[in-house]
């Protein structure tokens, strides 16, 4: 099953996550089909906290990909901020 989930990047005490489309059986940071955005939980100042390629996310959801719980929360947050702006 295809899953849209977070893959850990960044460095020590400075996490950074890529939103990736991958097979659910692959390792967290293993191979993936496509990167559709990123999430920076410790963004400061002018740094971007969340970036999502909505067109590609919608495509993958339309072909049956499932989101992880955290990614579902992030997409909901992204839609709220987009609607408010």
From Swiss-Prot:
Keywords: Ribonucleoprotein, Ribosomal protein. One of its GO terms (biological process) is translation. It comes from the Bacteria. Signal peptide: none annotated. Disulfide bonds: none annotated. One of its GO terms (cellular component) is small ribosomal subunit. GO terms for molecular function: structural constituent of ribosome. InterPro entries: Ribosomal_bS16 (IPR000307), Ribosomal_bS16_dom_sf (IPR023803). Belongs to the bacterial ribosomal protein bS16 family. This is Small ribosomal subunit protein bS16. It comes from Pseudomonas savastanoi pv. phaseolicola (strain 1448A / Race 6).
């Amino acid at each position: 099953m295809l899953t849209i989930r977070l893959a850990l990047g960044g460095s020590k005490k400075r996490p950074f996550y890529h939103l990736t489309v991958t097979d659910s059986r692959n390792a967290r940071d293993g191979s993936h089909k496509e990167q559709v955005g990123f999430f920076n939980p410790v963004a400061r100042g002018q740094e971007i906290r969340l970036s999502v390629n909505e067109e590609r996310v919608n495509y993958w959801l339309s072909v049956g990909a499932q989101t992880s719980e955290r990614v579902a929360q992030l997409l909901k947050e992204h839609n709220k901020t987009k609607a408010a702006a």
